[in-house]
C-alpha cells in the first residue's frame, strides 16, 4: 500500500567531470559563491575557492584556475580539456542568482555539476537551496 505523491522522470546524464557550485550568505561578507571539484572530491580533497557575489566573468574564469584540480579541467593524462568557457558562464550566472536572491537564499549547492569536453557544455545533476526563515 504505497502512498505515492508524485514521480520524477528525467534523463540519465552521461558521465562528466564533477564540480560543485555553492553559496553561503555570510554575515560579514554577504552572499558568497564557492567552486571546486565536486562529488566525493569536495568531501575528501576540500579543494574549493570562494568569492563575494556577484563575480565578474573574469573572476569566474579565475576561480576555475584557483583550485588544485584545475589541471583535471584543462585535460591531463590523455583526457580532453573540459568546457571551461561554459563552466565560467555557469559560475557567473550562479553568482548573479545568489546575489539577486540574497534576501531569500540562506545557502545552496549544485553538486555534482557534470562538465563535458570542450564545446559540449555541462549539466547540473543535483541541486539544493535552503531558504532563509521568514
Question: What do the predicted segments below correspond to?
Answer:
Residues 1-134:
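ATP-dependent carboxylate/acyl-activation modules
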